[in-house]
C-alpha cells in the first residue's frame, strides 16, 4: 500500500522543561481529526496511537493507569494529522514511549489479543530514533510486513521508548508460535539500511518475568 508524503508539519512544541504531560484535556486540544474519521483514503485496519511513561518498579496496574490513548486513525489523512501534531520522539523525556497498535488494543503484554504474541526488540542510536519510528509507522499501516509473516500471524503494533543512551523500538506480532517463519527483521533492515541496530532479539510476552496473567507492563 503506497502512502502519500506527509503534509507540512504542524507539530506541537514541548514546554521548555521538555515535560510531555499530554493529559486528557491537552489531548483534546490537539489539532486532530474530528469524528467521524471516514473521509480520505482508508487504512486496511484502524490503528491507535498511545502514550505512556514506564518507571522501574511500577505495578502492572500502575503501568496500565499511566497509558493514555491519543487517537484511533482510520485513514491516511487522519494518520498524518496525528503524527504531525504530537511531539517528535527526540522531544520526549526519558522513559516515555509512543505506541501504535492495530485496532484499539492496548500495548500491554497480557491484553487478550496480545498475550500469545511477542516483540522484535532492538536498540537504536538516539539520532536515528525519529526516522526509525516514522519508517516503521509507515510500514506498519501500509501492511508492508504482511508478506514477511506466517499466514497465521500479523504485525499488530510498533513502539518506541526513550532510554538513557540508546532508544528502544519494538515491533509486535500476534502469534509467537510461528515466529520462526517470519522475515520481519529482514524487512526492517531493508527499510532502514543505514541504521545501526543493536541488541536485536525476539521475545514472546509469556517469557517475560513480569508477565502476570491478565495485567501487564511493557
Curated annotation (Swiss-Prot):
Residues 8-23 have a biased composition (Basic and acidic residues). One of its GO terms (cellular component) is eukaryotic translation initiation factor 4F complex. Keywords: Initiation factor, Protein biosynthesis, RNA-binding, Translation regulation. GO terms for biological process: regulation of translation; translational initiation. Residues 1-23 are annotated as: Disordered. Pfam families: IF4E. Coiled coil: none annotated. It comes from the Eukaryota. One of its GO terms (molecular function) is translation initiation factor activity. The keyword Membrane does not apply. MRNA binds at residues 109-110, 163-168. eIF4F is a multi-subunit complex, the composition of which varies with external and internal environmental conditions. It is composed of at least eIF4A, eIF4E and eIF4G. Recognizes and binds the 7-methylguanosine-containing mRNA cap during an early step in the initiation of protein synthesis. PANTHER family: EUKARYOTIC TRANSLATION INITIATION FACTOR 4E RELATED (PTHR11960), EUKARYOTIC TRANSLATION INITIATION FACTOR 4E TYPE 3 (PTHR11960:SF66). Belongs to the eukaryotic initiation factor 4E family. This is Eukaryotic translation initiation factor 4E type 3-B. It comes from Xenopus laevis.
Amino acid at each position: 500500500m503506497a502512502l502519500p508524503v506527509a503534509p507540512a508539519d504542524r507539530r506541537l512544541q514541548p514546554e521548555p522543561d521538555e515535560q510531555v504531560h499530554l493529559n486528557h484535556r491537552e489531548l483534546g486540544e490537539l489539532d486532530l481529526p474530528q469524528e467521524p474519521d471516514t473521509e480520505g483514503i482508508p487504512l486496511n485496519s484502524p490503528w491507535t496511537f498511545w502514550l505512556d511513561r514506564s518507571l522501574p518498579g511500577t505495578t502492572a496496574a500502575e503501568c496500565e493507569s499511566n497509558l493514555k490513548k491519543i487517537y484511533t486513525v482510520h485513514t491516511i489523512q487522519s494518520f498524518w494529522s496525528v503524527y504531525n501534531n504530537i511531539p517528535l520522539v527526540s522531544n520526549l523525556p526519558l522513559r516515555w514511549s509512543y505506541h501504535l497498535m492495530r485496532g484499539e488494543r492496548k500495548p500491554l503484554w497480557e491484553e487478550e489479543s496480545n498475550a500469545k504474541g511477542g516483540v522484535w526488540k532492538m536498540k537504536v542510536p538516539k539520532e536515528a530514533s525519529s526516522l526509525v519510528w516514522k519508517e516503521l509507522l509507515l510500514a506498519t499501516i501500509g501492511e508492508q510486513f504482511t508478506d514477511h509473516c506466517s499466514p497465521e500471524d500479523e504485525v499488530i503494533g510498533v513502539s518506541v521508548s526513550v532510554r538513557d543512551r540508546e532508544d528502544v523500538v519494538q515491533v509486535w506480532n500476534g502469534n509467537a508460535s510461528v515466529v520462526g517463519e517470519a522475515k520481519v527483521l529482514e524487512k526492517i533492515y531493508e527499510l532502514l539500511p543505514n541504521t545501526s541496530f543493536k541488541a536485536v532479539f525476539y521475545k514472546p510476552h509469556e517469557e517475560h518475568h513480569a508477565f502476570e496473567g491478565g495485567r501487564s507492563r511493557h
